[in-house]
């Protein structure tokens, strides 16, 4: 009976926190004198670390770079962390939980932090669209499978 209880799936958020924040406006103040038609680039990255049995830290790194031509208007990076208890999940399900489900939870916090920093830099409001981490995770798995196939073909 206790074996069955140990295999039950469980998920709990222990903590969500800001791990690192950076905001740079290297070409201020003269960048404020230009027409605001920026090219905005969004980079996302996730990393997970096992802290204890069934306890994981997941860190979502979101970097936003806004450029006007060749000049960087601002560069904003947020590392949003979370500590999650994940029990009864292994293998691909655990990888999906840490690589997609947890980042989906963390992203709204990172987005709010970035929006606030950009606003404090007196730049026009930046609204980041929701991100489909499930699709990104599936793309990652497909890339990994493709690389594994290429390695076997080269051998």
UniProtKB/Swiss-Prot annotation:
InterPro entries: SecB (IPR003708), SecB-like_sf (IPR035958). Disulfide bonds: none annotated. Belongs to the SecB family. One of its GO terms (biological process) is protein folding. GO terms for molecular function: unfolded protein binding. It comes from the Bacteria. It is found in: Cytoplasm. This is Protein-export protein SecB. Homotetramer, a dimer of dimers. One homotetramer interacts with 1 SecA dimer. One of the proteins required for the normal export of preproteins out of the cell cytoplasm. It is a molecular chaperone that binds to a subset of precursor proteins, maintaining them in a translocation-competent state. It also specifically binds to its receptor SecA. GO terms for cellular component: cytoplasm.
């Amino acid at each position: 009976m206790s074996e069955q209880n140990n295999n039950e799936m469980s998920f709990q958020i222990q903590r969500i926190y800001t791990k690192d924040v950076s905001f740079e406006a290297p070409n201020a103040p003269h960048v404020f004198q230009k027409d605001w038609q920026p090219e905005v680039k969004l980079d996302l990255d996730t990393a997970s670390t096992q802290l204890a049995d069934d306890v994981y830290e997941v860190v979502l790194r979101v970097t936003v770079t806004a450029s006007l031509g060749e000049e960087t208007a601002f560069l904003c990076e947020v590392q949003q962390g979370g500590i999650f208890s994940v029990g009864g999940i292994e293998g691909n399900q655990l990888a999906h939980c840490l690589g997609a489900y947890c980042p989906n939870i963390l992203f709204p916090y990172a987005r709010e932090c970035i929006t606030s920093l950009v606003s404090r830099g007196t730049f026009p409001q930046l609204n980041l669209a929701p991100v489909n981490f499930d699709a990104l995770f599936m793309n990652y798995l497909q890339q990994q499978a493709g690389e594994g196939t290429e390695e076997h073909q080269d051998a």
